Amino acid sequence: MKVAVIYFGGQYNHLIVKDLKYLGLEAVAITPDKSVEELKEFDSVVFGGGPYSVINELDKMGFAPDYVKSLNVPKLGICLGHQLIAKVLGGEVRKANKPEYGLTTVNIVDEDTILRGLKPSIKAWESHNDEVVRPPSGFRILASSENAKVQAMVNNDNSIFGVQFHPEVKHTEKGIEVFKNFIKICRK
């Protein structure tokens, strides 16, 4: 399976590629200046983190909004990628009332799909100033934390996922399980 990992300049993006390769996938780092057509060869897309804000810097994210809307493959957004998916598909993203940095308790409210095996909670690495406050229509919330209601979300057909935390960072408990679960879903 070939996975495009969209790089937005986040400090942990290389770890996403490393984890996916460790799990036996062909993971390729892609900058968002490639056209949608150039990504048609991929079986899934993972949107990594980065320094931008989808609130007022969507224009700095190249063709990434088009990837969200136009590529008909399973997608996983991590941190900024999670916020990007929410914003582009009609959810609401705002400056966080209380930004999260470091280890945070993430409470799993629905462990179906990408969070299978992680209930009741995990300690997860966070690094964000913005947050999804309302998922797009047709999405449900999978996890929350004390300061962020939408720590994880999925669409109704279980093909588009977002997580606010960083499963690729070693400090996140069972982070690799998020990727394993995503791969299982992609292979269905």
Swiss-Prot record:
Superkingdom classification of source: Archaea
Annotated ranges, domain Glutamine amidotransferase type-1: 2-188
GO MF, one annotated term: ATP binding
Record EC number: 6.3.5.2
Cellular component per GO, a single term: cytosol
Keyword Amino-acid biosynthesis: no
PROSITE patterns linked: GATASE_TYPE_1 (PS51273)
Pfam families: GATase
Enzyme's top EC category: ligase
Subunit structure: Heterodimer composed of a glutamine amidotransferase subunit (A) and a GMP-binding subunit (B).
Entry function: Catalyzes the synthesis of GMP from XMP.
Listed name of the protein: GMP synthase [glutamine-hydrolyzing] subunit A
Gene behind the chain: guaAA
